[in-house]
A protein has these predicted regions:
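Positively charged, solvent-exposed patches that mediate nucleic-acid binding
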Residues: 1-136
Length: 136
């Protein structure tokens, strides 16, 4: 089981925003490779996870409810499905607070599997060829 730590620094959120992105009906999932820095160490068996909901979603009580629901769903999904040494950011959407919780969990699981698949595949054919050459 993977240890899930909290992403807190703004520069980490900005770095992850430049990485991969998968959209689902109730959330957006972003991911990027973890980088060590003076304010944090990368655990061998862990990943970092951050949450954000913008003011476009609604007033504070709606944004807070959306973040609570994202955290609860992530507690179910991430320990078994996330990859080590990857930083993830969950972004709440306008319907995150209202969507059925089981659907939110299933959409999060699908998005996480999709982004992990993209991470594990080589970026282009030249990378795949280099990987084959190294294997031989």
């Amino acid at each position: 089981m993977l240890k899930v730590l909290i992403l807190k620094k703004r520069k980490d959120f900005v770095r992850v925003a430049q990485g991969l992105k998968v959209a689902a009906p109730g959330l957006i999932l972003q991911a990027a490779q973890s980088l060590s820095s003076p304010h944090r160490e990368i655990p061998e068996d862990g990943c970092f996870l951050g949450y954000t909901v913008t003011k476009k979603v609604g007033k504070a009580h709606i944004r807070n409810r959306s973040k609570r629901r994202l955290r609860a769903a992530a507690r179910e999904v991430f320990p078994d499905n996330a990859r080590a040494k990857i930083d993830y950011v969950l972004i709440g959407r306008y319907n995150t607070a209202d969507i059925e919780f089981k659907k939110l969990v299933s959409e999060m699981k699908k998005a996480l599997c999709k982004i992990n698949k993209i991470i594990s595949e080589p970026q282009d054919k030249t990378d795949a060829k280099k990987a084959d050459d190294i294997a031989d």
